[in-house]
Amino acid sequence: MYQRLPAEDRWFSDPQTGQRIHQLTTHPSINHHPFFLSPAWDDAMRHIVIVSDRTGKNQLNLLQTADGTLIRISDVEEVDEWTVHPSRDGRYVYYHGDALGLRTDCATGQSEILITEEEAARLCGESVTFPLGKTTALSHDDRFWAIRARSASRWYALVLDTQTQKWKMEYEAEEVSHMQFCPDTPDYLFCAGPLTDRVWVLDRRTGQARRVFQRDVAHKQWITHETWIPGTLELSLVDWPHGILAVHCETGKIRRIADFNAWHAISNEQGTMMAADTNFPDVGIRLL
């Protein structure tokens, strides 16, 4: 699929702050970027990946930054919207759709099946499915793509080496939630556990996972929405509603970054600034 659509972006000013805002889509449907852990842009910022349900089902669209043109590139029945992860070199978008692991070429719209549930089951040694609405992870160098598979009692992290096209089951646990490769080395893969035992990092060299942060159970501490801070080997942790913490994945050293009710917090590429929305109350997006 490679269907060009007319540009529909517009500029306007925020009535309260006066900031100029660039609205990328105006179609009366749900249009959104990938989950906050995944980059929406390629590194060269030639296009932004948008999930749109303007056809009645979620599909992948590229918005060209040069002229605002939209290009639909997916042709599955429906894209699993939160699995979408663009590659940084701008060549591919990786995602699930129709119970398949896929990647689509951004230049041609040609899609390639990377894994089926039957192939995943052979890797896991039991019947599994690809859970809906769950994020995937692509390493910073675009080499490794990590996905999740689920059986009746276990969760698995499966990793594709995109150079050799070989899959490997690298981790299994009672639950595997969000995953993200460390931007400084693909050897570390953050694998969130359940909300009650959240922060785990898989050392892919040894196959061993370590809990790098222990929540305060007595005070019902809520840790969520973890993400790497580039250049630091640290994970930022939303300690909702009390602020943001950072923990070093090797030393376990903890520091506090912020003390407001951040919800989704993500760092810039340099690891020097973060942006975060806020939750209960919603007081807008903050930079820190």
Question: What kind of region is each of these model predictions?
Answer:
Residues V49-T55, V93-C106, T136-D142, A146-A152, ...:
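Beta-strand C-termini and the immediately following turn/loop, strongest in propeller blades
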Residues H242-G243, A258-L288:
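Loop/turn-rich, solvent-exposed surfaces of beta-rich toroidal or solenoidal domains
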Residues I30-L37, K57-D98:
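Blade-loop segments of beta-propeller domains
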Residues V76-S87, R91, Y95-W155, E170-V176:
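Asp-box/WD-like beta-propeller blade repeats and closely related beta-sheet repeat scaffolds
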Residues M1-H22:
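Blade/loop signatures of beta-propeller domains
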Residues H27-H32, I73-E78, I115-E119, G125-F130, ...:
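Surface loop/turn motifs at the tips and blade-to-blade linkers of beta-strand repeat domains
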Residues P34-S38, V79-H85, G125-E126, P131-A137, ...:
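Repeated scaffold domains used in trafficking and secretory/extracellular systems
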Residues Q64-G68, C106-G109, D161-Q165, D203-G207, ...:
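Short loop/turn segments that connect beta-strands within beta-propeller blades
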